[in-house]
């Protein structure tokens, strides 16, 4: 109802829709996307329509990344984040967590068919909450390949201080 009254002429009504094509191909961080979070945001916005590879340039990336479900992913349309050089020592993704709600550097909360390869991931927290990777939310087929993981330095056997924390079942983790 325009202006709170019945529409006298429905023939002139319009609707606008913006459609985004799914991502496919190889992209560079930070050339095409400044951060891993920026790449994740575009994945969530556009989805994928083929294999997507993000080559991460040598450097340190201080950020925390949460991957929800992404439209279009499958065994034939996967997502890979990898060191551009192929050298694990060249890329460091780090974050300092501060509580149970953010106890991760990389989190998969519904993401499927996603791989991290040849990178270092470190939680720089110095107290209790030090998970590095958290997998949950019905995430499936998550692969961590040739990665170096380091949790916080606090000595505990707590649930909140694991290099890889998996919640739920049947994740297809490798």
Give the ranges of each region predicted by the language model.
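Extracellular/luminal regions of secreted and cell-surface proteins that mediate adhesion/ECM remodeling
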Residues: 1-22
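Acidic glycine-/aspartate-rich tracts in secreted/extracellular proteins
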Residues: 2-5, 32, 45-47, 58-62, ...
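Acidic Gly/Asp/Thr-rich repetitive segments characteristic of extracellular carbohydrate-active
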Residues: 23-62, 66
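Extracellular beta-strand solenoids
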Residues: 29, 45, 63, 67, ...
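Right-handed parallel beta-helix/beta-spiral solenoid domain characteristic of secreted/periplasmic
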Residues: 64, 72-128, 151-159
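Solenoidal tandem-repeat scaffolds enriched in leucines and small polar residues
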Residues: 151-174
């Amino acid at each position: 109802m325009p202006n709170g009254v019945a529409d006298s002429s429905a023939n002139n009504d319009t609707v606008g829709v913006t459609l985004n094509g799914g991502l496919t191909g190889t992209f560079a961080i930070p050339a095409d996307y400044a951060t891993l979070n920026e790449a994740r945001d575009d994945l969530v916005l556009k989805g994928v329509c083929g294999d997507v590879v993000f080559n991460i340039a040598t450097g340190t990336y201080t950020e925390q990344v949460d991957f929800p479900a992404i439209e279009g992913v499958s065994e034939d349309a996967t997502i890979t984040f990898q060191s551009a050089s192929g050298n694990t020592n060249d890329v460091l993704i780090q974050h300092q967590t501060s509580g149970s709600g953010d106890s991760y550097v990389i989190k998969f909360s519904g993401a499927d068919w996603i791989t991290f390869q040849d990178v270092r991931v470190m939680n720089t927290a110095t107290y209790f909450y030090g998970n590095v990777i958290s997998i949950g939310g019905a995430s499936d087929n998550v692969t961590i390949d040739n990665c170096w993981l380091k949790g916080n330095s606090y000595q505990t056997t707590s649930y909140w201080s694991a290099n890889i924390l998996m919640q739920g079942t049947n994740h297809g983790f490798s």
